[in-house]
């Protein structure tokens, strides 16, 4: 009876499993309470171990092993903190796994070893599921790109849709030198445009066409970090990343500003070398134009001294200003301000002389009326010619012959001379003269 009561009490307090063990131990004359207590302790240890295994299993898979990582770091060793990409601000697993990319599909598709300080960039999975790029991927910056030229299309015309018929988009080359960053960022912007991300690229005013999404920001950060190693970044880029390691948009905006500045510098140099001035425009406007160009070049690191500036200005002077080339050629220390004083003096003299001249311009109607009422009082000279020639007129040859004969025979009187001259003279077809024999 006592053993049956103990077995029932054991069954209620310790469960069916322990009750069966207790009933078995009754036949060996051992205390069933001691046995049940030991078995209960073993059950509790087993359950605690099982629970610990269940809780530790997801933790081990929280940071999956990266098949693309060349040399993964142990979890106990903290990654290095130097460089513009800090570990304490690393993106979460969800942020590092963007979806919906048509070309790369995901940053893990890029076949490059990630940074040692960022082991969470690439998700797990077999590498065969990601499309591979041609052998041209990862070529140096000097290798020509299949896209012709570095001309950028308008960001406003870029399609923000993530679907495309292209099989792949060639990624930008690896940056290998800080001096190559201006050329590299052009190819990187071209890569973003080909990836249907032209709308997030800053425009001329520094603002993008549309707002960037979280997945696009992650893709932008990952690709920039992979293809632009931190040791090859210029100092100004490192300064931006030291403040905000994800501010890639600011880097792109500053890069575009520098591109425009380089273009402006070239235009300013060409304009300064081809100056032309002849007084047709105000001297103040000409001086403002030239000084603004010189100040811009000096601020951008292209120093233009007074000697070079004066030579360029004087070479473009023409008209009355041309003599300034010779009056000042001996003054080696002449400044731009002194040269413009002479230009202003000539311009003011020109304006004063033009204002002092009276204006006698008459109306066109008055001139027409005067021309109609004007009469010519002087009689024109009229030369009257006799249309009928007499047959007894002599030619010059006959007259000369008569004069010669009259000189040879002075005894002949005037009547005989006049009589001989009144007789007709006959000419043959050869224009020879035939006189009468008596006249010889």
UniProtKB/Swiss-Prot annotation:
Annotated site residues (Cleavage) in this chain: 401-402
One Pfam entry name: TYA
Subcellular location: Cytoplasm
Source species, domain of life: Eukaryota
Segments of skewed composition (Polar residues): 48-60, 127-152, 419-428
Basic and acidic residues: bias regions: 429-440
GO biological process: viral translational frameshifting
Modified residues (Phosphoserine): 416
Record's compositionally biased regions (Low complexity): 1-16, 153-165, 402-418
Main location per the UniProt record: cytoplasm
Written domain comment of the UniProt record: The C-terminal RNA-binding region of CA is sufficient for all its nucleocapsid-like chaperone activities.
Function (record text): Capsid protein (CA) is the structural component of the virus-like particle (VLP), forming the shell that encapsulates the retrotransposons dimeric RNA genome. The particles are assembled from trimer-clustered units and there are holes in the capsid shells that allow for the diffusion of macromolecules. CA also has nucleocapsid-like chaperone activity, promoting primer tRNA(i)-Met annealing to the multipartite primer-binding site (PBS), dimerization of Ty1 RNA and initiation of reverse transcription.
Misc: Retrotransposons are mobile genetic entities that are able to replicate via an RNA intermediate and a reverse transcription step. In contrast to retroviruses, retrotransposons are non-infectious, lack an envelope and remain intracellular. Ty1 retrotransposons belong to the copia elements (pseudoviridae).
Subunit structure: Homotrimer.
Protein name: Transposon Ty1-JR1 Gag polyprotein
Species in which this protein is naturally found: Saccharomyces cerevisiae (strain ATCC 204508 / S288c)
């Amino acid at each position: 009876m006592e053993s049956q009561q103990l077995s029932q009490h054991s069954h209620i307090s310790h469960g069916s499993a322990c009750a069966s063990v207790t009933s078995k131990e009754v036949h060996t004359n051992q205390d069933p309470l001691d046995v049940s207590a030991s078995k209960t302790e073993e059950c509790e240890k087993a359950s605690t171990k099982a629970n610990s295994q269940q809780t530790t299993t997801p933790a081990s898979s929280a940071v999956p092993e990266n098949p693309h990582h060349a040399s993964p770091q142990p979890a106990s060793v903290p990654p290095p903190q130097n460089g513009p990409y800090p570990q304490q601000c690393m993106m979460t697993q969800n942020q590092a796994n963007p979806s919906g990319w048509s070309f790369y599909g995901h940053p893990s598709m890029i076949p490059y070893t990630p940074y040692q300080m960022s082991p969470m960039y690439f998700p797990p999975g077999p590498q065969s599921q990601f499309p591979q790029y041609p052998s041209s991927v990862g070529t140096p910056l000097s290798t020509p790109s299949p896209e012709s030229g570095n001309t950028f299309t308008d960001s406003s015309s870029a399609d923000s849709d993530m679907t495309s018929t292209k099989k792949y988009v060639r990624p930008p080359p690896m940056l290998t030198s800080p001096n190559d960053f201006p050329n590299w960022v052009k190819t990187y912007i071209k890569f973003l445009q080909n990836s249907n991300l032209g709308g997030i690229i800053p425009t001329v005013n520094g603002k993008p066409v549309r707002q960037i999404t979280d997945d696009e920001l992650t893709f932008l950060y990952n690709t920039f970090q992979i293809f632009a190693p931190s040791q090859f970044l210029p100092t100004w880029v490192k300064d931006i990343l030291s403040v905000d390691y994800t501010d890639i948009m600011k880097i792109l905006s500053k890069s575009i500003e520098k591109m425009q500045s380089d273009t402006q510098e070239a235009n300013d140099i060409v304009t300064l070398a081809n100056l032309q001035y002849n007084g047709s425009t105000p001297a103040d406007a000409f001086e403002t134009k030239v000084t603004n160009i010189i100040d811009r070049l000096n601020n951008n690191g292209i120093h233009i001294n007074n000697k070079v500036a004066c030579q360029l200005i004087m070479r473009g002077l023409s008209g009355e200003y041309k003599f300034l080339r010779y009056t000042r050629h001996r003054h080696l220390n002449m400044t731009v301000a002194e040269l413009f004083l002479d230009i202003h003096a000539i311009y003011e003299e020109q304006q004063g002389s033009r204002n002092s001249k009276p204006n006698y311009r008459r109306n066109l109607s008055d001139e027409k009326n005067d021309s109609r009422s004007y009469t010519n009082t002087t009689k024109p000279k009229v030369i009257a010619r006799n249309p009928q020639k007499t047959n007894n007129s002599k030619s010059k040859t006959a007259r000369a012959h008569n004069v010669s004969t009259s000189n040879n025979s002075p005894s002949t009187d005037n009547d005989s001379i006049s009589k001989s001259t009144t007789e007709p003279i006959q000419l043959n077809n050869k224009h020879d003269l035939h006189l009468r024999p008596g006249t010889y």
